[in-house]
A protein has these predicted regions:
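Hydrophobic, membrane-embedded alpha-helices of multi-pass small-molecule transporters
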Residues: 5-24, 43, 90-94, 98, ...
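Membrane-water interface regions at transmembrane-helix termini and the short interhelical loops
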Residues: 61, 101-111, 125-146, 209-212, ...
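Extracellular loop-to-transmembrane helix junctions
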Residues: 4-5, 32-59, 216-229, 326-333
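Hydrophobic alpha-helical segments and their helix-loop junctions in multi-pass secondary transporters
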Residues: 21, 95, 128, 132, ...
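Transmembrane-helix boundary/entry motifs in multi-pass membrane transporters
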Residues: 2-5, 35-39, 64-93, 111-117, ...
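Juxtamembrane transmembrane-helix boundary signature
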Residues: 45-71, 233-237, 241
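Membrane-interface interhelical connector segments
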Residues: 177, 238-261
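Transmembrane alpha-helical segments of multi-pass small-molecule transport proteins
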Residues: 8-15, 44-49, 86-95, 111-135, ...
Length: 355
């Protein structure tokens, strides 16, 4: 029973990180999936399968190496020299996602509560900085605690959309602008790469903290399945009111508003919480890559990177997403391919599995 409890904790932490950059606002799902109609569900399945299988493998690798950061995992996948190159590209890209999420938090505070964007982003940075002063187990608990709430809200919104939505499933392709199978399939891979790249470093570290490979692998597997279900549900909900949400900055708030003003308020809080999850997880991974956690250098590092990310977030949420997200998708897919190749290579050689 204890191993299942630990696996579920890992799964919720995993989902909590990738959801922040993945679909907390709904805008990401709209751009990558919903606008391509019914075909988008093929992309959703592809993305979910990437997160499920690859997440399981990477969590097990993290446990095998007792990893505190992703360096040893990348060296295992790519070799020392190429692994180092991928390491620096990934960690700098993850920092760019951190900046993007801080900008998104500022925008969410502004649109939901009328708080100035600069102040909303500052509040988020202060909360993240304080949490980073705690040990990693506390961070895992912080990451996981909001995920069940998000799951309930997404299911509630999707269920309401099933009965109240103005667009039936059979009519979706007639209202979307770009019902395209090819692009939907590519976006499934690209989005899966994006979500995996965002969660990679944190999942390796969480796997390194797990007691056994079986537990960490199960946690990654459960996390991927939960992510697949959530992604499919939110895509369905967006389709059910597509004509109303297609031009919205934060589509999920529009959907919540059609159900209840109270739900809109609660969802706003949860959206900020999952953004916090992502910023927190990525900031820790960045600091842990260059320092030993909870040393003087670590505290100095977080005292630099958090204020710097806040300053750079003034570039703007939409502008950052347009540049950072496609790039992260490609980087993530590169690592995904390496994990798959390594898996089948070791299987063909009949070697003892690290993952």
């Amino acid at each position: 029973m204890k191993k299942y409890s630990e696996a579920i904790k890992i799964a919720f932490a995993y989902v909590g990180v990738v959801v922040g950059a993945g679909f907390s606002t709904g805008q990401e799902v709209l751009q990558f999936f919903s606008q391509f109609g019914i075909y988008s569900y093929i992309g959703v399945v592809i993305s979910g399968l990437i997160l499920t299988f690859i997440g399981r493998q990477v969590a097990k690798i993290g446990t095998a190496f007792d990893a505190e950061n992703h360096e040893s995992t990348l060296e295992y996948l790519f070799g020392k020299k190429l692994g180092l190159v991928i390491d620096y590209v990934l960690i700098l890209s993850l920092y760019a996602v951190t900046i993007t999420m801080i900008a998104g938090a500022g925008s969410t505070f502004n649109e939901s509560f009328g708080v100035p964007t600069w102040l909303g982003a500052l509040i988020m940075c202060i909360i993240v900085y304080i949490t980073l002063l705690m040990d990693f187990n506390k961070i895992v608990r912080a990451l996981g605690v909001v995920t069940p709430v998000l799951i309930v809200l997404v299911i509630l919104i999707a269920a309401a959309s099933l009965f109240q939505g103005s667009i039936p499933f059979s009519k979706i392709n007639s209202v979307v602008e770009k019902p395209n199978l090819g692009i939907a399939i590519w976006n499934g891979f690209n989005y899966g790469g994006l979500a995996f790249a965002v969660g990679f470093s944190t999942l390796v570290a969480i796997g390194g903290d797990a007691s056994k490979r079986l537990v960490s692998g199960l946690g990654g597997l459960i996390g991927g399945v939960v992510y697949l279900v959530l992604l499919g549900l939110i895509n369905f909900a967006l389709h059910s009111e597509y004509t109303e949400i297609k031009d919205a900055a934060i589509p999920t708030l529009v959907l919540a508003g059609k159900i209840s003003p109270i739900l809109t308020f609660v969802l706003s809080i949860v959206m900020l919480a999952v953004m916090y999850n992502t910023i927190l997880g990525l900031s820790y991974s960045f600091a842990a890559r260059f320092t030993s956690p909870y040393t003087k250098r670590y505290y100095l590092m977080i005292s630099i990177i958090v204020p710097l990310a806040y300053a750079l977030s003034f570039v703007g949420f939409e502008g950052l997403i347009a540049v950072v997200y496609p790039m992260m998708g490609v980087i993530g897919l590169f690592i995904v391919v390496a994990v798959v190749v390594k898996y089948f290579y070791r299987k063909s050689q009949d070697k003892k599995f690290i993952a």
